[in-house]
Regions:
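Phosphate/nucleotide-binding beta-alpha loop and adjacent structural elements of enzyme active sites
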Residues: 1-296
Length: 296
């Protein structure tokens, strides 16, 4: 994200409302300080959770600047999950969602990340938070069937499975399994899938998991990137509806869910909720969270 885009994003972020100057001062301090300090910086985050961040890291620096980079979705996770729930993070990257679920909340987790550099950063953050006993990190892709896939390896948080005919990039070969095979009957309460357009294939290999009544919700990236593989995102929505889920958006300040007819037009991610009244009760009874001095 370029600096002008970053400034716009920070200025408009819900946790920075009424605090624009303070947020921009934090951004400027990071731009200067991160270049003066050699190596990664430990950032104290939420409820004692922390992460290692380096200058230029796209996903994690968003949390430095705003508190919660993807506010609605991350707050939904924090309000929904309870200690010892099972959380599955498909496309974990450096582990933002895994850290929130397993370090801040105390849930158990599976974190899937096939990119070698991102996987190294993920495991660093798991060790930093001393949650190795609660998180299983797996350096692999998930898809519709077992096999292998070529991945880009030089696009930071935008690394993805190479599409047919995609021009040459630096690539690595990754193993592919299915979510159903890996979980082998374990029952998550929440699944997050952010695999840069490969979401439809992941869901195809997760049909047994999607049918589990204990799966309360899923956070799925739907931003048009599936077109590179010939996937129609309306089919992703239809798949989730077919498994009994409702598309929703979430307001963390009012702790209210709003039902949607399809993907969330205001976000790159869409929440899918199985039992809206049950999930709403969990959300409203969760303890308050404080991030960057804002409580919700």
């Amino acid at each position: 994200m370029l600096i002008p885009q970053s400034i716009r994003f920070i200025s408009r972020h819900p946790l920075n409302r009424g605090r624009k100057l303070k947020a921009l001062a934090r951004f400027a301090a990071w731009q200067i300080g991160s270049r003066l300090v050699p190596g990664p910086v430990v950032f104290e985050w939420v409820r004692g959770a922390k992460f290692l961040v380096r200058a230029g890291e796209r996903g994690l620096t968003g949390n430095v600047h705003t508190g919660l980079h993807e506010f609605g979705e991350m707050a939904f996770l924090l309000h929904l999950l309870r200690a010892d729930d099972l959380f599955v993070d498909v496309g974990a990257n450096a582990g933002s969602y895994t850290i929130l679920a397993c370090a801040a909340v105390g849930a158990r987790g599976y974190a899937f990340e096939p990119g070698p550099d991102a996987y190294r950063r993920l495991t660093e953050n798991v060790r930093l938070n001393r949650i190795e006993d609660r998180v299983t990190c797996l350096e692999m892709c998930l898809g519709a069937e077992p096999g292998t896939v070529l991945l880009t390896d030089d696009l930071d948080s935008a690394n993805h499975a190479l599409a047919p005919g995609e021009p040459g990039a630096r690539t690595v070969t990754a193993a592919v399994s299915t979510l159903d095979a890996v979980l082998d009957g374990e029952r998550p309460a929440l699944v997050k899938i952010d695999v840069e357009g490969y979401e439809a294939a992941v869901l195809e290999g997760a049909r047994r998991t999607l049918d589990e009544p204990t799966l309360l919700a899923a956070i799925i990236e739907l931003n048009g990137s599936g077109e590179r593989y010939g996937f129609d995102e309306s089919q992703v929505v239809a798949t989730m509806f077919g498994h009994g889920f409702t598309a929703c958006s979430y307001d963390p300040f009012t702790r209210s869910l709003a039902r949607l007819s399809g993907r969330d037009p205001a976000s790159d991610n869409t929440l899918f909720v199985r039992d809206v009244p049950l999930v709403a009760e969990r959300l409203t009874t969760a303890e308050k969270i404080t991030v960057h001095g804002r409580q919700f």
